[in-house]
Amino acid sequence: MKRLLSIITAVMMLALALTGCAAKQSPEGEVEKTQAKGSIILATTTSTSDSGLLDYLLPEFTKDTGIEAKVVAVGTGQALQMGKDGEADVLLVHSKAAEEEFVAAGDGLERKDVMYNDFILVGPANDPLKLKQELPNDIVGALKKISEQKFKFISRGDDSGTHKKELALWTEVGITPEGDYYVSAGRGMGDVLKMADEMQAYTIADRGTYLSMKADLGLDIIVEKDTNLFNQYGVIPVNPDKNENINAEGAKAFEEWILSEKAQSLIGEYGKEKYGAPLFTPNAAK
């Protein structure tokens, strides 16, 4: 009986040893990918979501890393707050000054440029204030005229990167917009574009989201190509000290992937076929 038990024990130990060897003999990349599997929470702007960019990129990220990215699309201010509260692993946002403050405060590990597009002023196709004719590349002049004429303007009003840019532009104008003409929506970019369309109002939008929705809107680009309208996006892994549950390895994997040659090439191609030009221009440091 003792001999039988000894034989059974030996067989079991041999089986375990063979299993371990099999795991070690797996292709190196496959083992690493299995270890990396899991999920991350990506807090990002509504513009990267509404434009369709993330639907285009993230399946490739998951395919390459085995990591699923769960997206929370909010304004940049809310995304940064999620990072501060330890409720996101990595951020993809577009308000560089606020992002740099976030990192300087120790809430993020580092910030790196990913891509850019630009902001535009859009409005009714008939352009009641004739801004496109008179001020096609002067956003400060256009906002001043909108305020003077008390013409309906829709603000994001959500502490997003777009909202922060709009407020900075009003500061340059020297005006604090208020009154019935100025509508603070507290909504994402897609919803605000729909509101501007329905109310025949002007609004500031990022070019990518506007182009992705243009076919369903009665809005035209009114002011563009002003240096004040540059729109840079950055990636920030959240400091894992903010929350013990933060997936620091997954966040680092996303940062490295979004800055990689493959991802940068994908970003540069997105929108070319449908719109004749990319919705975002990759500019990660080489």
Swiss-Prot record:
The keyword Membrane applies. Keywords: Cell membrane, Lipoprotein, Membrane, Palmitate, Signal, Transport, Tungsten. Gene3D superfamilies: Periplasmic binding protein-like II (3.40.190.10). PROSITE patterns: PROKAR_LIPOPROTEIN (PS51257). GO terms for cellular component: plasma membrane. InterPro entries: ABC-Tungstate_binding, PBP_domain. The keyword GTP-binding does not apply. Disulfide bonds: none annotated. A lipid is attached at C21 (N-palmitoyl cysteine). Residues 1-20 form the signal peptide. A lipid is attached at C21 (S-diacylglycerol cysteine). Its main location: membrane. It is a lipid-anchor. Part of an ABC transporter complex involved in tungstate uptake. Specifically binds tungstate. Monomer. The complex is composed of two ATP-binding proteins (TupC), two transmembrane proteins (TupB) and a solute-binding protein (TupA). This is Tungstate-binding protein TupA.
